[in-house]
Design a protein with these regions (language model features):
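A structural signal for the main folded, soluble domain(s) of proteins
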Residues: 48, 54-56, 60-70, 115-119, ...
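Gly/Pro-rich active-site loop or hairpin
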Residues: 3, 44, 82-85, 108-182
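Active-site beta-loop-alpha junctions enriched in small/polar residues
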Residues: 36-38, 74-78, 105-110, 142-149, ...
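Conserved beta-strand positions in the central sheet of alpha/beta enzyme cores
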Residues: 32, 101, 143, 185-186
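C-terminal helical cap(s) of enzyme catalytic domains, especially alpha/beta-barrels
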Residues: 194-210
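Short helix-capping segments at alpha-helix termini
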Residues: 60-68, 93-97, 132-136, 178-180, ...
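Active-site acidic/histidine proton-transfer and metal-coordination neighborhood
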Residues: 1-101, 109
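Short acidic/polar active-site loop segments enriched in Thr and Asp
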Residues: 29, 182-183
């Protein structure tokens, strides 16, 4: 979406249209996507291109009959990629139907371990609510896994058993329960998605005393 080449940006819109058709056929409503990398341009220039592509994508989806679909730009794990929290929230500002996909493992990786405490999670949730409003922020999309990182950000996804890698899921599940937030949460652990998703569900239910 942020490419210097217009053809590639236009192709991104077509990919979203194709994804919308498949999503509808499967009974889904949310389309998660990556907004691109900065490449040889500044972050500001890359974001402006992505914002323009996003506006065109929303228009194209509406014209094609997919106005009921929710676009979800994802926070990204590599430093060179477009996808900081604020960049994703800026993309969400294009249309009130756009919902952020917050990948907490990615944010932890690109900030080189910036999510260490419950307060760190709370700051992310607070920022979403500040920019989007409480109602939109309540129903965001979540990807979660422990991720190994280097100086450039994300390297590899791991499992919940690999506790040498962060971030920790427990504080997030507690905050979701305490704040009565209702995101869609997808576990992206390496090979143990179902098991680790169940672990998060148990943490969430315990925090709600269910």
């Amino acid at each position: 979406m942020s490419s210097l080449e217009e053809d590639k940006r236009l192709n991104s819109i077509q990919y979203l249209l194709q994804s919308a058709a498949v999503c509808r056929a499967l009974g889904g409503k949310r389309i998660i996507f990556h907004s691109g990398s900065c490449g040889k341009q500044s972050r500001e220039a890359a974001l402006e291109k992505a914002l323009d592509t996003m506006r065109r994508a929303v228009e194209a989806l509406d014209e094609a009959g997919f106005a009921d679909m929710t676009l979800c730009p994802e926070t990204m794990g590599k430093v060179g990629q477009l996808g900081t929290l604020d960049e994703v929230l800026a993309l969400c500002g294009v249309d009130s139907r756009i919902t952020p996909c917050i990948d907490f493992g990615h944010l932890n990786a690109r900030t080189l371990g910036g999510i260490q405490t419950k307060a760190d999670y709370a700051a992310i949730l607070d920022r979403m609510a500040e920019v989007l409003g409480d109602d939109r922020a309540r129903q965001f999309h979540v990807h979660f896994s422990r991720i190994e990182y280097s100086a450039g950000g994300e390297k590899r996804h791991w499992t919940f058993a690999d506790t040498q890698f962060g971030p920790e899921p427990q504080p997030l599940m507690e905050l979701l329960a305490q704040r009565q937030l209702t995101p869609v949460v997808i576990c992206e652990s390496a090979g143990t998605q179902a098991e680790d998703a169940q672990t998060m569900q148990q943490m969430y239910r315990a925090a709600r005393n269910v």
